[in-house]
Amino acid sequence: GSNATAVWAAKLGMNLQSSTLKDDETGEPFHIQQAKQIRAYRQAWAEAGHTRQPRVSVSRSIFALMDDRDRMYFGSSRNESDSVGYLDEKTRAIFGRSYAAEPDKLIEQLKKDEAIAEADTLLLTVPNQLGVEYNAHVIESILKHVAPEMGWRDRNA
């Protein structure tokens, strides 16, 4: 969606879920545009005078490369940059990059994502076609090897 849609949602008192696609309104990298969208949403929320705190979530495809299987699925075909396209003849959209790297590199990359820093919640998109067992591995790898360093989860959890 657009920044205007996020502002509209804030005025109505709705929480914001911003996924991996938004209108390309400035030509800047996806994470910067999404962070600006979140800031516009929060400002509109404050101006509307709502009494509760809003919730904002963003979605990301994040894969910690832990073994040969991870490298086979995500290591060589990493989409390390945003993609741009048109939803219709007037609407230019930007699709956020995927993150796939060894945990230490992944942490460095994720710390630079402004929208992740602005959000209250991070939703992980997982490749459900690869099955429950593999997706449990993907999520566990993030929880154990990335989340503690990002401050998302207690190291002892």
Task: Name these PLM-found stretches.
Residues 1-157:
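Active-site-adjacent structural elements that line small-molecule/cofactor binding pockets in enzymes
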